[in-house]
Structure formats: C-alpha cells, structure tokens
C-alpha cells in the first residue's frame, strides 16, 4: 500500500491466516497501526504538517490553538458555523462541576500535578455518563467539553500544588489568556496579560498539538478501540505521557542546563562528556526517534525563547548555555554523523521557566497541547470503525511442564 505522500507499507492483514506467521517488531518502529489523514511527518527532511499545513506556516500566521484544534479534528481552517459553535462552546464551558473542585481537596500539596490531571480527567466521566456514546453529535460535544475543561483542571492542578485558591475562568478571554489568568491570577486583582508570553504559549501548544503515532496517542487509540469512556481514554493517554521517556524530556533538559551552570557553565566540557563512551552523561534535547534532521518545531521555539526573555527582562544564563551547546553540536562531526539535532524539548523548558511555570508542570503543559491530537485520533478511529486492538507476542517461556 502507498500513502498520499508516497510512504510505502506492506499490508500484512492476512499474513497469519495465510501463512501461520506473525511479525515481531518490539517498539513498533516498523509497524503502521492504522491509516490516518491527520498528521504527516518526514523525519529525514524535517517536515511536520497538520492536515497538509506545514507547522511553520501555522505558527507564522499566528493561527490560534483552538483553530488548530479544529483543524486536527475536522480537517479545515476556513470559518464556518460549525467552527464558530465549536470555539464558542470551548470559551463558555471552561468551568468544572463544583463537586469536582472539592475533589482536589483529596490531593496532598506534594501530589504531582500529573497525578491531579489524570485523576480529574477520569473523574469527568462521572459527570458525563454519555462518555462512551458512539453518536457523532455526542462525540463532538464531549470533545469540545474536554478541550474547554482540561485547561481549567491543569491550572487548578498547579494552584493546588502551591496551596493557592482557585481562580474561576473568565469567558471574556481567549483560550491561552484564560489559562494564564487561572494559573497566575490573584483574587481581587487585575491580571495583566503579556502579549509576547501569550503568543509564545499559543505557539508551544500548537507545536505540541499532534505528532502522529507516538506512545500516548497510540495508547489513546489502544484504549479507545475497546469503546472505553472517552474521558477515561484520554486519562490513559495522560498516564502514558507522564513517563520520562515521553513527556518529561524538557524537564530533563532544564535539569541538565542547571547542572552545567552550577558546575561553572563550561559547556565544552559537557560536549566532550557526551562524546565519551565511558561517560554516563547524555546531552538532553538532542536527537529524536523520528527526526533525522533539525526538528522543525525546535527552530520556531528557539526564536520564541529569546522574545519571551527579552519581554520579561529576564537574563537567563541557561539560554546562553543552550545556544552554545547547539552551536557546537551542529558543527561537530560526532553529532552531525549521528543526526543528533536539537528537538522541541531543547528550548521549550526555558520558555516555561521564564513564564513562571515550575518543572513539575512541564508535562502537564505537554498534555494540554497534545489533547486535540489525542482527540482527533480517537475520533478518526471511532468513525472509521476500527476493530479492537489486539497485538500478539512470541512466547519464549517454559514449554509444557508436569506438576
């Protein structure tokens, strides 16, 4: 079979039935689990497109996160009554049930914000008993409901972990502004929006909105294939994202940069350590499972990082260290020959840090951005009528034994 971008695959749907063989592909690096029209990636050329639109163009034109969400879900950017209704629903349904607000009291201050997020998204299923409906209209409403409410849950997860009172959503604000207001607003005080910060956060959310069949998206498809409740299915995706090999990479970058700074800022020393086979040090934020070229998202974020720091008048030495590491690595044969280029995580943590978002919230921010991608893939799977996912394994245990 051949995709619309000339990607070639071997259809093995009937392999076991006709030959008795199955394929073995640990990690699924050579396996296409489905057909999809949502996101195209060419890792060799550094291409990422949502529904045909290059990610760089979406950012350059300032397309909003809610518009990109609609694009991923329904395939179009053009204005329509359906799109207007979608955005209005998201704007006016950001509040969560008051009983859910009280659920937060069950979490300790030390609870990880991802624990709060995952649990509270699952709890939404208790307030939405039609979460397992296959009716297209109900599906679309539940999708908009999740996009509207997860940002509120994310902001409340942050405030809970800091012992701060919740700030209720303001329906007069756009998606990103409302999130920042709920995160950093104070009771009885006006919250002053910073347009550069809002724009940078919108960019980060857009860049993270989808990335084809990654671990968490595949988890959503896997759980959703059983027709599990949508809210619980998204919670499964959040759990998969929580893993440090998936959603925690930008936190690891910040911790690495902080370590280099505390050690005197000698970035050349750490370049040498990264190349030393005897060293356990790994240069975080370089290389990607898919991209064998410069991650197109990283190029965009690099510029946004400087804009945010300049706007907030922050002189962050970590940005200088990051730039120096990148400059050397892009010219060093060791990294070039191994196709180790900066990825999206290399600069995103610096932006979050400048905004005042703590490192334990970085993965929550990733989840907030990835939500429309999860929902788009779930919707596509349900409407395509894909059967329940059921991989097999090659048994390598004991043969039959006697008691």
What are these regions (language model features)?
Residues 1-403:
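Non-transmembrane, aqueous-exposed alpha-helical and coiled segments at domain scale
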């Amino acid at each position: 079979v051949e995709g619309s971008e000339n990607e070639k695959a071997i259809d093995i749907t009937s392999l076991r039935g006709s030959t008795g063989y199955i394929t073995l592909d640990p990690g699924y690096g050579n396996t296409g689990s489905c057909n999809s029209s949502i996101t195209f990636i060419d890792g060799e050329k550094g291409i990422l497109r949502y529904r045909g639109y290059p990610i760089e163009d979406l950012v350059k034109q300032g397309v909003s996160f809610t518009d990109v969400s609609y694009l991923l879900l329904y395939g179009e950017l053009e204005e329509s009554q359906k799109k207007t209704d979608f955005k209005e629903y998201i704007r006016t349904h950001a509040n969560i049930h008051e009983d859910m607000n009280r659920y937060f009291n069950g979490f300790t201050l030390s609870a990880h914000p991802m624990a709060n997020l995952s649990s509270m998204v699952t709890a939404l299923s208790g307030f939405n008993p039609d979460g397992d409906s296959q009716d297209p209209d109900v599906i679309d409403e539940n999708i908009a409901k999740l996009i509207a409410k997860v940002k509120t849950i994310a902001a409340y997860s942050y405030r809970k972990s800091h012992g701060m009172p919740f700030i209720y959503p303001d329906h007069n604000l756009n998606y990103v502004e409302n999130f920042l207001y709920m995160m950093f607003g104070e009771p009885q005080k006006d919250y002053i929006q910073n347009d550069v910060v809002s724009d940078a956060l919108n960019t980060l959310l857009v860049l993270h909105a989808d990335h084809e069949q990654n671990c968490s998206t595949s988890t959503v498809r896997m759980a959703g294939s059983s027709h599990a409740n949508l809210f619980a299915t998204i919670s499964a995706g959040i759990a998969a994202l929580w893993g440090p090999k998936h959603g925690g990479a930008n936190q690891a970058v910040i911790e690495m940069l902080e370590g280099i700074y505390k050690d005197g800022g000698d970035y050349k020393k750490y370049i040498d350590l990264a190349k030393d086979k005897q060293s356990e040090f790994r240069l975080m934020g370089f290389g990607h499972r898919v991209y064998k070229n410069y991650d197109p998202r990283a190029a965009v974020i690099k510029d946004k990082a400087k804009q945010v720091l300049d706007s907030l008048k922050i002189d962050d030495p970590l940005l200088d260290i990051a730039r120096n590491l990148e400059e050397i690595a892009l010219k060093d044969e060791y990294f070039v020959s191994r196709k180790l280029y900066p990825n999206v995580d290399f600069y995103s943590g610096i932006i979050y840090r400048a905004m005042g978002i703590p490192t334990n919230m970085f993965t929550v921010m990733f989840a907030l951005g990835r939500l429309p991608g999860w929902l788009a893939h779930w919707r596509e799977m349900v409407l395509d009528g894909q059967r329940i996912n059921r991989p097999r394994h090659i048994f390598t245990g004991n043969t039959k034994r006697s008691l």
